[in-house]
Amino acid sequence: MLSANVVYELQTVWFPNMTDAGLGRLMDLLESGSPLLIHGCFTRATPMGCLATHVGWHHPRTEHMVHEAGITWLTRVAGLNPATSAVIREWDYRGPHDWRLRSDLLDVLKAEQQSRQRKSERAAKRQPDLVVV
């Protein structure tokens, strides 16, 4: 189970700064147990990166970066200190081989994706129909 601090940081800092593409990428990597998702460093060799790096590679402000995408996304986009980020600390401590961590993160990511889809559907319903005169 994820700690309350990790869930809070995801919901209040990561998700508001994460693109749909970044969210989808993390979900794909976690679901497949991909070796491209690493821990202990931001980037080992492209395309291997940590959570923040894969999010950074899918964000318009940092997608052009290679090795610096994760740290730059985390510090300049999300406004977090990598040394004190609850998400990064938990990921680095437990790592991608902890199936429970992957499963718990995936559950939170899926909930966010569903929330975004519901908001998008509600917004689409609010769009007034064009009236032809």
Go through each PLM region and give its residues.
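Short, glycine-biased loop/turn motifs at secondary-structure junctions and
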Residues: 1-133
